[in-house]
């Protein structure tokens, strides 16, 4: 028997029609007032839906938080900024400071072996009195000796300053050597210039070990290291010249050790006493 024969409505009168539109759970979601089971078990008064505003009115509110415990906006970016200021920024500032001071220190060391106006006395001593040939190898050995004297003071700095200044000074030295190889000797091949730089690096390492051993030992050991590196083991070297160079080394190492850390980092008082003046000074 059909519904029409019984003259029954399609659904009970108290059953609400489905509503399309926005709800508290999201846009355009179909909602029904109740299911067919609710029609059987509940009366129409019980199926009345509560207003969300009424529900919020009776819902207990959380107490306000202490503003001192609430994270500020963009707290992640603020943490990154604090980490940068605490760990990274001081190292970068130290690196820039070391680079600038190392440039001045290297200029003081490199001009001792070049005919500069303010270093003609040292230039004449190394190339005329010592009779060292004016070659790139001789310039490298003389400059390396002055840089080693600077490194003896750099080793006494705090850990971070020691690493920054030592790296900056060595980097400046090898950059200048590479520039001289390309510019003065017209060697444009990176492979050939790299081979020369590797050989010079090995010579530098050996010279540092020799000078360190001589500085901790006697004057005879230091003179032997100077004779082996600067004079390439020549048998006709005057012993008086070796004595003058040993006095020059010890006097300049002593002068730099007397400088305070701040003065040395800022480059104050960083200069070399010429060898001939060192021979007339008693340490």
UniProtKB/Swiss-Prot annotation:
Protein origin, superkingdom: Eukaryota
Disordered: annotated segments: 43-70
Basic and acidic residues compositional bias, start-end: 45-58
One GO term of the biological process aspect: mitochondrial respiratory chain complex III assembly
Pfam families from the UniProt entry: Ubiq_cyt_C_chap
One term under GO cellular component: mitochondrion
Family assignment from sequence similarity: Belongs to the CBP3 family.
Protein name: CBP3-like protein
Annotated source species: Schizosaccharomyces pombe (strain 972 / ATCC 24843) (Fission yeast)
Gene behind this protein: cbp3
């Amino acid at each position: 028997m059909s519904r029409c024969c019984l003259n029954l409505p399609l659904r009970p009168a108290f059953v609400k029609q489905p509503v399309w539109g926005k709800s508290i759970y999201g846009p355009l979601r179909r909602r029904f007032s109740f299911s067919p089971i609710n029609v059987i078990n509940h009366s129409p008064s019980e199926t009345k839906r509560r207003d969300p505003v009424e529900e919020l009115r009776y819902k207990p509110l959380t107490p306000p938080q202490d503003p001192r415990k609430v994270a500020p906006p963009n707290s992640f970016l603020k943490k990154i900024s604090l980490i940068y200021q605490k760990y990274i920024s001081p190292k970068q500032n130290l690196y820039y400071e070391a680079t600038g001071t190392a440039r001045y220190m290297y200029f003081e060391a490199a001009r001792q072996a070049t005919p500069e106006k303010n270093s003609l006395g040292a230039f004449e001593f190394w190339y005329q009195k010592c009779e060292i040939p004016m070659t790139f190898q001789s310039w490298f050995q003389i400059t390396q000796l002055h840089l080693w004297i600077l490194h003896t003071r750099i080793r006494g700095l705090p850990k971070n300053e020691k690493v920054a200044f030592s790296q900056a000074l060595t980097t400046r030295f090898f950059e200048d050597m590479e520039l001289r190889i390309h510019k003065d000797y017209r060697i444009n091949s990176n492979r050939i210039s790299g081979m020369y730089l590797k050989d010079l690096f090995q010579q530098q390492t050996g010279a540092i070990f020799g000078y360190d051993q001589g500085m901790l030992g006697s004057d005879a050991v230091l003179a032997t290291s100077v004779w082996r590196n600067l004079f390439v083991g020549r048998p006709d070297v005057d012993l008086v010249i070796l004595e003058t160079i040993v006095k020059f080394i010890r006097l300049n190492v002593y002068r730099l050790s007397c400088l305070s850390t701040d003065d040395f980092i800022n480059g104050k008082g960083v200069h070399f006493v010429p060898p001939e003046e060192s021979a007339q000074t008693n340490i």
